C-alpha cells in the first residue's frame, strides 16, 4: 500500500514538472513537451505542404475539368459483369473438355488391344527426350517425333502446334504393352486438340491424364526447358497432380490404420512410414483423413482425434507423427478396426461425407476380424484397402480377404520401388461408381489454384473423367466395364481471369477477389506464392520475395480468404455467404495491411459479392469510399495529346522532372517492361507512330496517363521549378492513379527506388487511407545503416470534391534531409537556460533519449548519433523495454499475421543419396563388414539394385549431381509470422514510469497532430537496465498457429454437391493379388552371389 502511494506521488510530481530522474533538474512538464511537439509539427507540416504543392495540384485538377469526366464505379454492376465474363470463359473451356472426353471414350472403345507392335509402329513425341541426350532414339515398337519448336508468348516457352507431347513417369517402362496400346489409341486425340484450338485460339494446355500414368498434352513442348533448369530430376506423375486427383474420384473420408506391433520393426516399419506419407499425397483439400496406429490397443498417431481436412498443414502433422511411431507388442486387428470404424462413422465433425475408406498397412497376420466387419460394415459402405508391407512369410490370405469382402483392394509393397505405384492405384477402385453412374458423373469440376508444371504460373483446371465404355450397349443398361480410363483437363491461367476483372479504375486500394467452396482464394492481391519447385514457373512477385526453386512445390496453393486479409467477424460472415453462393454487400471499417507488410491502417471498405454461375466459385469487389468515382480523361484533340506526351520524353526530364510510367498493357503491340527507360522510349515511339486512339490500344488507359502527365508537368513548371531551393528538402514527387511518377529535380529521380507501378506503391496506398501527412521510414532491414541518407519520405493524398463527388487522383510529397531535420529537432527541444542534464533533448545526452517514431513503431529521428544510424529500424530492436511499455499503455496495438506462402532455408542440409527418401544408403564401412549383409538393410539394397537392373529407368529419377541436389533444395516452403504495430486510439498524450524492478525510467509521449508521428522523451536506457529481449517486427520463420487447436474449430466449407461412392452394379471381385514387382528367386540368388564376390574379392575397388 505504501509503495503504491509513493508511486502515485512520484507520478504526480513528475507531471507537475517538479522532479526528474536525477533529482537535479525537473523533468520537462507535459505542457513544455507539448509546446515543443506543436512547434515540430507546425514546421514539418508547413514544410511538406509548401514544398509538395498538394494544394496547387488540386487546383490544377479543378481548373481543367473540361478535360475529364467523373464516372461512377457501380460495384454491383461491375462485379456481376465480371462474374458473367468469367462464367463465359470457363463455359467455353468446358465445351472443349466435353469434346475431348467424348472422343477419348469413342476412340478407346473402338481400339483393338494388341500384344505386339511392329518396329517403330507407334509414333509419338516423348516430352522428356531432351532430358537425356544419350537415351535411345525409341523403345521397341515406337518411333520418336522431333517437333520444330517456336517461342510462344502465350505459354512463355517453346511449343509446337503441330504435335502433342507425351509424358511417361520415370518408373513406368515406355516399351510395355500397356503403354504402347495407350500411345496408339490416344494419338487420335491430337486432332481434337487441334480442332479445339481452331475454335478457341486462347486455349492453353489440353491434357489427358491416363490411369496408367501416361499424360498426353497439347501443344507439344519439352518437359523441362534445359536453358532454365538444366539436369533436374523428373518425379512428375500425372496421377498425383491436384486436378487428376479431384477428377478421378469423389471426395474421400479416409482412416489410415497402421500396424505397429513388434513384427513390423526395422525395414518394414520404414517402408510403412514412407507408404503412409505417399498415401497422404494422394489426398486433396476436398478430402478428410486421420492416421491411427494399433497393436494390442489402438490410438491416434497425432493430436488429431477425428478426421481432419487433408490440407498441407494437417498432412504435415500426420507425416511427422507417423515418422515417430515405434513398433512393439502384438497385433490385434479387432482393436484396430473397431477404432477405425468408430472414428470413420463419427458424423459430428466436419468431413467429406462421401467415399469412406480404411487403409490398412501391416506385415500380415492370421486374424480376419470378421465380427468387426459384420458389426460395422454389413452394407459394405466402407471400403477396406489392405497393404502387405515388407518381405515376410505370413499368409496373405487374411488381409486379402479383408479387402475383397469390403469392396476394396489388396496390394503388396515388398520394397521401396513399389510404394508410389501401389499407394495411388486405389483411385481406380474409387472410380468404379463414377463409371457406372455414366452421364450423371460427367460433370465438369474446377480445381483449387495450383502452380502449373508447364510454366503457366497459377492456374485452375477444368476436369472431366473419361470412362471405359467398351462392351456398353447403346441404351447403357449392359454395363460390362467399370474402369476409369483417366481424366481430361483444360487449364485456365489466373492471368486470363484477371483480365476480366479490370483494376485501373478502382484506385490502388480497390480490388477483386474470388474464392472456392473451401474458402481458398483464386484471385486476390495477396495471393503470391513463391515458385520453389524444379520446373515451376517464375511469376511476378513482390521484390522482397526470393525467387528460388525446390521440388517440394507440387502442393496446391491454398490461401484462405481469412488468411489473405486481416480477419474480423464481418469477413467471416462474408466468406460463409460467398461459399453458400449468395449475393450481398457490406460496408464496414477494417484493418488493412500495407503493401510492404510493415504497417496497418484503418479504412472503410465496401464488399460486394456474387456467385459465378456454372461453377462453385464466388467473386467479390472491394472498394474504399474514395473509389466510388474515378476520372475518365477525354483528350479528344490530338494536339493536346501530343503536347502532354511530349512531357514524357527523357529529353525533358531536366525541366519536367525524372518521369516513370506504370508498366501496364496500354496496347497489344506494346509489351510492358521492368526497364522504365526502355519502356518509356517504346511508349513514346508507339504513341507518336500510331496515336493513342489506335484500335489496338486501351484508349482510356492511354488518355488517363497523358492527362496525368500534363497535369503533373504543370505542377513542376508552374510551382516546383519557381520555388527557390528549400532547406531540408532533397526531392519532391507526385504519383498518380493514371500511372505517372515525377521526381524533381532530375538527379533525385535517378536514385528513385519506388515501384513505377503506382498501384503497387506501399506509401501511395497508405496515403490514400490517411488524411494526415504520412512519414515513411526507410527500409533498415533491407538497406541497413545509412538508408536514411536518401531522405525520409513525406506524402499526402490530393483530395478533390468534383460536383460533390470525392476523388483522390494523386499523392504528392517530399523527401526530407535527415541532417536538417535533426538540426531543427534539436533546436526545438532545447531549453535555455537549462543547467541540468534532463531538462531537454540535448544532442547525445547521456541521460535522456528523445526519439520520433512513426505509427508502425519505426525510428525516424533521435537526439543520439548512434540512433541516427538506425533510422528506419523497428524501435523494439533498439529499446525493447520501452516499446513493450508503449504497447502496455495502449499507445500501440499490434496484429500478428502469418504468411503461408513463404520460402525459407532448410533447417538442416539433407544427405545426398541415390535412393528414395526412405531408402537406406550404406556406408563403405557397412559394405566391407560381411556381417552387415545379414541385416534387413542389406536386403533393402538388394531389392533396389535388382529393381534398377530389371527396370533400369525406375530409379533414374533419383540420380543427381551434388550441386544440382544442393541447389534444388536450397529453399523450402514454410510459414513465417510478422507483427505489425499501429496506433490503438486517438489519445494524444501519455506519461508515466517504466518500472524495471530495481529502477525506473520517467517518460512522456506526445503525438504530432496531422501526421503519423509520435514524440517520446524518456530517461536513457543506459541509466536503468531493463528487459533487453528484442521485440521483433520483421518476418520470422514460424510453426504457425497450432494445427491441433485449429481443427477443433474448422472454418466453414462446402464439399461437392454430388457423390459417387457406391453402385449396386459394381463388380468388386477384382480385389488384388501379387505385386508385379516381385523379383524371381533365381535373380535374387544371382545378384547376391555377384555382390558377395565384389565384397570379398574387390575391396580395393570399393575403396
Curated annotation (Swiss-Prot):
Post-translational modification remark: Proteolytically processed into subunits alpha-2-1 and delta-1 that are disulfide-linked.
Record-linked Gene3D superfamilies: PAS domain (3.30.450.20), von Willebrand factor, type A domain (3.40.50.410)
Primary role: The alpha-2/delta subunit of voltage-dependent calcium channels regulates calcium current density and activation/inactivation kinetics of the calcium channel. Plays an important role in excitation-contraction coupling.
Protein name (record): Voltage-dependent calcium channel subunit alpha-2/delta-1
Further comment found in the protein's record: Binds gabapentin, an antiepileptic drug.
Free-text tissue specificity from the UniProt record: Isoform 2A is expressed in skeletal muscle and aorta. Isoform 2B is expressed in brain. Isoform 2C is expressed in heart. Isoform 2D is expressed in heart and smooth muscle. Isoform 2E is expressed in smooth muscle. All five isoforms are expressed in the cardiovascular system.
Residue ranges constituting the Cache domain according to the UniProt record: 446-537
Family: Belongs to the calcium channel subunit alpha-2/delta family.
Extracellular compartment spans: 25-1073
Entry-listed glycosylation sites: 92, 136, 184, 324, 348, 613, 781, 888
UniProt organism field: Mus musculus
Membrane topology designation: Single-pass type I membrane protein
Signal peptide: 1-24
Phosphoserine: modified positions: 119
Quaternary assembly: Dimer formed of alpha-2-1 and delta-1 chains; disulfide-linked. Voltage-dependent calcium channels are multisubunit complexes, consisting of alpha-1 (CACNA1), alpha-2 (CACNA2D), beta (CACNB) and delta (CACNA2D) subunits in a 1:1:1:1 ratio.
UniProt binding sites for a divalent metal cation: 259, 261, 263
Intrachain S-S bonds: 404-1059
Cytoplasmic-side positions: 1095-1103
SUPFAM superfamilies named among the record's database cross-references: vWA-like
Keywords, sorted A to Z: Calcium, Calcium channel, Calcium transport, Cell membrane, Disulfide bond, Glycoprotein, Ion channel, Ion transport, Membrane, Metal-binding, Phosphoprotein, Signal, Transmembrane, Transmembrane helix, Transport, Voltage-gated channel
One of the GO biological process terms: regulation of ventricular cardiac muscle cell membrane repolarization
Gene Ontology CC, one term: T-tubule
Localization in the cell: Membrane; Cell membrane
InterPro entries: Ca_channel_alpha-2/delta, VDCC_a2/dsu, VWA_N, VWF_A, vWFA_dom_sf
Coiled-coil segments on the chain, per record: none
Amino acid at each position: 500500500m505504501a509503495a503504491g502511494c509513493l508511486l502515485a506521488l512520484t507520478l504526480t510530481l513528475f507531471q507537475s514538472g517538479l522532479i526528474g530522474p536525477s533529482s537535479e533538474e525537473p523533468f520537462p512538464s507535459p505542457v513544455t513537451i507539448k509546446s515543443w511537439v506543436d512547434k515540430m509539427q507546425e514546421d514539418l507540416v508547413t514544410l511538406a505542404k509548401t514544398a509538395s504543392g498538394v494544394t496547387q495540384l488540386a487546383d490544377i485538377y479543378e481548373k481543367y475539368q473540361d478535360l475529364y469526366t467523373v464516372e461512377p464505379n457501380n460495384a454491383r454492376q461491375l462485379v456481376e459483369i465480371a462474374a458473367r465474363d468469367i462464367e463465359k470463359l470457363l463455359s467455353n473451356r468446358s465445351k472443349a473438355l466435353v469434346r475431348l472426353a467424348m472422343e477419348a471414350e469413342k476412340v478407346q472403345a473402338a481400339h483393338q488391344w494388341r500384344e505386339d507392335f511392329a518396329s517403330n509402329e507407334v509414333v509419338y513425341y516423348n516430352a522428356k527426350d531432351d532430358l537425356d541426350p544419350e537415351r535411345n532414339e525409341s523403345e521397341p515398337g515406337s518411333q520418336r517425333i522431333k517437333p520444330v519448336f517456336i517461342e510462344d508468348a502465350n505459354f512463355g516457352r517453346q511449343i509446337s502446334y503441330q504435335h502433342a507431347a507425351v509424358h511417361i513417369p520415370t518408373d513406368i517402362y515406355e516399351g510395355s504393352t500397356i503403354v504402347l496400346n495407350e500411345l496408339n489409341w490416344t494419338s487420335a486425340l491430337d486432332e481434337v486438340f487441334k480442332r479445339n484450338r481452331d475454335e478457341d485460339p486462347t486455349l492453353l494446355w489440353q491434357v489427358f491424364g491416363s490411369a496408367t500414368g501416361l499424360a498426353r498434352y497439347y501443344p507439344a513442348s519439352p518437359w523441362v526447358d534445359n536453358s532454365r533448369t538444366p539436369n533436374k530430376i523428373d518425379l512428375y506423375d500425372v496421377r498425383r497432380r491436384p486436378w487428376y486427383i479431384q477428377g478421378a474420384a469423389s471426395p474421400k473420408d479416409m482412416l489410415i490404420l497402421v500396424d505397429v506391433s513388434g513384427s513390423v520393426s526395422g525395414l518394414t516399419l520404414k517402408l510403412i512410414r514412407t507408404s503412409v506419407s505417399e498415401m497422404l499425397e494422394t489426398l486433396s483439400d476436398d478430402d478428410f483423413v486421420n492416421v491411427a496406429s494399433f497393436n494390442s490397443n489402438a490410438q491416434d498417431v497425432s493430436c488429431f482425434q477425428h478426421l481432419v481436412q487433408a490440407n498441407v498443414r494437417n498432412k504435415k502433422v500426420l507425416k511427422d507423427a507417423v515418422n515417430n511411431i515405434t513398433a512393439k507388442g502384438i497385433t490385434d486387428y479387432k482393436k484396430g478396426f473397431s477404432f477405425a470404424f468408430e472414428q470413420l462413422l463419427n458424423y459430428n465433425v466436419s468431413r467429406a461425407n462421401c467415399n469412406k475408406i480404411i487403409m490398412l498397412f501391416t506385415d500380415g497376420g492370421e486374424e480376419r476380424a470378421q465380427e468387426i466387419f459384420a458389426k460395422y460394415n454389413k452394407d459394405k459402405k466402407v471400403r477396406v484397402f489392405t497393404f502387405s508391407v515388407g518381405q515376410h512369410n505370413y499368409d496373405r490370405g487374411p488381409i486379402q480377404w479383408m479387402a475383397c469382402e469390403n469392396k476394396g483392394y489388396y496390394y503388396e509393397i515388398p520394397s521401396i520401388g513399389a510404394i508410389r505405384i501401389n499407394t495411388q492405384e486405389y483411385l481406380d477402385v474409387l472410380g468404379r461408381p463414377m463409371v457406372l453412374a455414366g452421364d450423371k458423373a460427367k460433370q465438369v469440376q474446377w480445381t483449387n489454384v495450383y502452380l502449373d508444371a508447364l510454366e503457366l504460373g497459377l492456374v485452375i483446371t477444368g476436369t472431366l473423367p473419361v470412362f471405359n465404355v467398351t462392351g456398353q450397349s447403346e441404351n447403357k443398361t449392359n454395363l460390362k466395364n467399370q474402369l476409369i480410363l483417366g481424366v481430361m483437363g483444360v487449364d485456365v491461367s489466373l492471368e486470363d481471369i484477371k483480365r476480366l476483372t479490370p483494376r485501373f479504375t478502382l484506385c490502388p486500394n480497390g480490388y477483386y477477389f474470388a474464392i472456392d467452396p473451401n474458402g481458398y482464394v483464386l484471385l486476390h492481391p495477396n495471393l503470391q506464392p513463391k515458385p520453389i519447385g524444379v520446373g515451376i514457373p517464375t511469376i511476378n512477385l513482390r521484390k522482397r520475395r526470393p525467387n528460388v526453386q525446390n521440388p517440394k512445390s507440387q502442393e496446391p496453393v491454398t490461401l484462405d480468404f481469412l488468411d489473405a486479409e486481416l480477419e474480423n467477424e464481418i469477413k467471416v460472415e462474408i466468406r460463409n455467404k460467398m461459399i453458400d453462393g449468395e449475393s450481398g454487400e457490406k460496408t464496414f471499417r477494417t484493418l488493412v495491411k500495407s503493401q510492404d507488410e510493415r504497417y496497418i491502417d484503418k479504412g472503410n471498405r465496401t464488399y460486394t459479392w456474387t456467385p459465378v454461375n456454372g461453377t462453385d466459385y464466388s467473386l467479390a469487389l472491394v472498394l474504399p469510399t474514395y473509389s466510388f468515382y474515378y476520372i475518365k480523361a477525354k483528350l479528344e484533340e490530338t494536339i493536346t495529346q501530343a503536347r502532354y506526351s511530349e512531357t514524357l520524353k527523357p529529353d525533358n526530364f531536366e525541366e519536367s522532372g525524372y518521369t516513370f510510367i506504370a508498366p501496364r498493357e496500354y496496347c497489344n503491340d506494346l509489351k510492358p517492361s521492368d526497364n522504365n527507360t526502355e519502356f518509356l522510349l517504346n511508349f513514346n515511339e508507339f504513341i507518336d507512330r500510331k496515336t493513342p486512339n489506335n484500335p489496338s490500344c486501351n484508349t482510356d488507359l492511354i488518355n488517363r496517363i497523358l492527362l496525368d502527365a500534363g497535369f503533373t508537368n504543370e505542377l513542376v513548371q508552374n510551382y516546383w521549378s519557381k520555388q527557390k531551393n528549400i532547406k531540408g528538402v532533397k526531392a519532391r514527387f507526385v504519383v498518380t492513379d493514371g500511372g505517372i511518377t515525377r521526381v524533381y529535380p532530375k538527379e533525385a529521380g535517378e536514385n528513385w527506388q519506388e515501384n513505377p507501378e503506382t498501384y503497387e506503391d506501399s506509401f501511395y496506398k497508405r496515403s490514400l487511407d490517411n488524411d494526415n501527412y504520412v512519414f515513411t521510414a526507410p527500409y533498415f532491414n533491407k538497406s541497413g545503416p545509412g538508408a536514411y541518407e536518401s531522405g525520409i519520405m513525406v506524402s499526402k493524398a490530393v483530395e478533390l470534391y468534383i460536383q460533390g463527388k470525392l476523388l483522390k487522383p494523386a499523392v504528392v510529397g517530399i523527401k526530407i534531409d535527415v541532417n536538417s531535420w535533426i538540426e531543427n529537432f534539436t533546436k526545438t527541444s532545447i531549453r535555455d537556460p537549462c543547467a541540468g542534464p534532463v531538462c531537454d533533448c540535448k544532442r547525445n545526452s547521456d541521460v535522456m533519449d528523445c526519439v520520433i517514431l512513426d505509427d508502425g513503431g519505426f525510428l525516424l529521428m533521435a537526439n543520439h548519433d548512434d540512433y541516427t544510424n538506425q533510422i528506419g529500424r523497428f524501435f523494439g530492436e533498439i529499446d525493447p523495454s520501452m516499446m513493450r511499455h508503449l504497447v502496455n499503455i495502449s499507445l500501440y496495438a499490434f496484429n500478428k499475421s502469418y504468411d503461408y506462402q513463404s520460402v525459407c532455408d532448410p533447417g538442416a542440409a539433407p544427405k545426398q543419396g541415390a535412393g528414395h527418401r526412405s531408402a537406406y544408403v550404406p556406408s563403405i564401412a557397412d559394405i566391407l563388414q560381411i556381417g552387415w549383409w545379414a541385416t534387413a538393410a542389406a536386403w533393402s539394397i538388394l531389392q533396389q539394385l535388382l529393381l534398377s537392373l530389371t527396370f533400369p529407368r525406375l530409379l533414374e529419377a533419383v540420380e543427381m549431381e551434388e550441386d544440382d541436389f544442393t541447389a534444388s533444395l536450397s529453399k523450402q516452403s514454410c510459414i513465417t509470422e510478422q507483427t505489425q504495430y499501429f496506433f490503438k486510439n486517438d489519445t494524444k498524450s501519455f506519461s508515466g514510469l517504466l518500472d524495471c524492478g530495481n529502477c525506473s525510467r520517467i517518460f512522456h509521449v506526445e503525438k504530432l497532430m496531422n501526421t503519423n508521428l509520435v514524440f517520446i522523451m524518456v530517461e536513457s536506457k543506459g541509466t536503468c537496465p531493463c528487459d533487453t529481449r528484442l521485440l521483433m517486427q520483421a518476418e520470422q520463420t514460424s510453426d504457425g498457429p497450432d494445427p491441433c487447436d485449429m481443427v477443433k474449430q474448422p472454418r466453414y466449407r462446402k464439399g461437392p454437391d454430388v457423390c459417387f461412392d457406391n453402385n449396386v452394379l459394381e463388380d468388386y471381385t477384382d480385389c488384388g493379388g501379387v505385386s508385379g514387382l516381385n523379383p524371381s528367386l533365381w535373380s535374387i540368388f544371382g545378384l547376391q552371389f555377384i555382390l558377395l564376390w565384389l565384397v570379398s574379392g574387390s575391396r580395393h575397388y570399393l575403396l
